[in-house]
């Protein structure tokens, strides 16, 4: 909602036209790196997209159930890697405004690879870089197409987030195990620590 409004204010285009144009472009680009790319949208709209994101930075926060989940993963000896389709500037803003980085061993923007989590090429490049055992890896995401891509690659443990947006109702997810509150997993994680070889 913020982008069409600001695009209208800064350029004089009607807000309804801005909204319709963006909706059409989002549909074409969904799942592609451009959809997530602040540089692309800055060029396309001739707007300072990173600055506009800062205008709504009060909306950037960690879910309240996330710290306990990530702490349990840390305490259990598991390596925690965050892989996001977000542009590096979006990721930097989140790191600046939340304690997320204190819980994560490695933060990766798919922009480093030029492909998104929806694409098999990304999973191949991640495995080459990180050397993970796909069958023993847990991957958590709120996007069903991304979870399907991870499944196709052979990720052994997949978990869907049924309520990624607190302003929206909980989604019914049948294709994958789903979680509403990460804290529900803490006891099981701590009960099964990783044994170092």
Annotate the PLM regions.
Residues 1-20, 152:
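Active-site neighborhood of HAD-like aspartate-dependent phosphohydrolases
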Residues 1-3, 28-35:
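Short acidic alpha-helix initiation/capping motifs at coil-to-helix transition points
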Residues 4, 35-38, 123, 182:
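A general structural signal for well-ordered alpha-helical segments in protein cores
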Residues 18-19, 52, 137:
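Small-residue helix-packing motif on alpha-helices
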Residues 20-26, 54-58, 107-109:
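Short linear capping/connector segments at secondary-structure termini
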Residues 32-44, 49-82, 88-92, 120:
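Short, acidic loop-to-helix structural element flanking the phosphoryl-transfer center
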Residues 71, 87-88, 92-197:
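Asp-based, Mg2+/Mn2+-dependent phosphohydrolase catalytic module
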């Amino acid at each position: 909602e913020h982008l069409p409004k600001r695009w209208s204010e800064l350029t004089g285009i009607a807000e309804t036209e801005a909204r319709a144009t963006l909706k059409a472009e989002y549909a074409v680009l969904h799942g592609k790196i451009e959809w997530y790319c602040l540089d692309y949208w800055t060029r396309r709209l001739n707007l300072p997209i990173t600055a506009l994101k800062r205008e709504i930075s009060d909306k950037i926060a960690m879910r309240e159930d996330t710290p306990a989940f990530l702490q349990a993963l840390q305490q259990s000896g598991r390596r925690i890697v965050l892989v996001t389709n977000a542009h590096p500037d979006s990721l930097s803003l989140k790191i600046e405004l939340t304690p997320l980085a204190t819980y994560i061993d490695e933060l990766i923007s798919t922009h480093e690879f030029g492909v998104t989590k929806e694409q098999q090429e990304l999973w191949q490049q991640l495995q080459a870089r990180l050397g993970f055992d796909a069958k023993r890896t847990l991957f958590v995401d709120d996007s069903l197409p991304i979870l399907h891509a991870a499944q196709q690659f052979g990720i052994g443990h997949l978990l869907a987030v049924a309520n990624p947006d607190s302003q929206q109702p909980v989604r019914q997810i049948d294709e994958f195990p789903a979680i509403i509150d990460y804290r529900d997993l803490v006891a099981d994680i701590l009960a099964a620590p990783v044994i170092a070889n």
